[in-house]
Amino acid sequence: MNLIGIDNNSGEKVSEEIDLIMRSSDGTLVFVEVRRRSSASHGGAAASVSAVKQRRIVFAARHYLMRLREPPACRFDVVTVEPSGIEWLQGAFDAT
């Protein structure tokens, strides 16, 4: 995958809601939410991506896609960072 944009709090933001925008080898645009938790006491990192957060990410992605002449297929992934390790959840949610 190739990195297209990152929200690193230094300079111009890609989006207020989207942490990473990447393009996979098949051309799919991947919007990535990164979540970190020090413990699973409240359901873990993946559980922290609520329905409200998902809607905000989808809204921001649609706004980003409007800037493109020919928007490609896209998907929404979540990367979780926990004491037990890092997990990449591809297609974690969809835009519906």
Identify the residue ranges that each predicted region occupies.
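Active-site metal-binding core of divalent-cation-utilizing nuclease and nuclease-like domains
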Residues: M1-F31, T96
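Active-site donor-binding loop signature of nucleotide-sugar glycosyltransferases
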Residues: L3, V34-R36, G91
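Short connector loops at helix/strand junctions that flank enzyme active sites
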Residues: K13-E17, G27-L29, G44, V52, ...
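Conserved catalytic cores of phosphodiester-cleaving nucleases, focusing on short active-site segments
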Residues: I18-M22, D26-S41, V49, I57
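Residue-level recognition of specific faces of alpha-helices
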Residues: L20, A45-S48, R75-V78
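Residue-level signal for pocket-adjacent positions within structured domains
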Residues: R37-A40, G44, S84, W88
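Short, charged, amphipathic alpha-helix that recurs within catalytic cores of restriction-modification
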Residues: A45-L68, P72
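Domain-level recognition of nuclease-like catalytic cores that cleave nucleotide substrates
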Residues: M66-T96
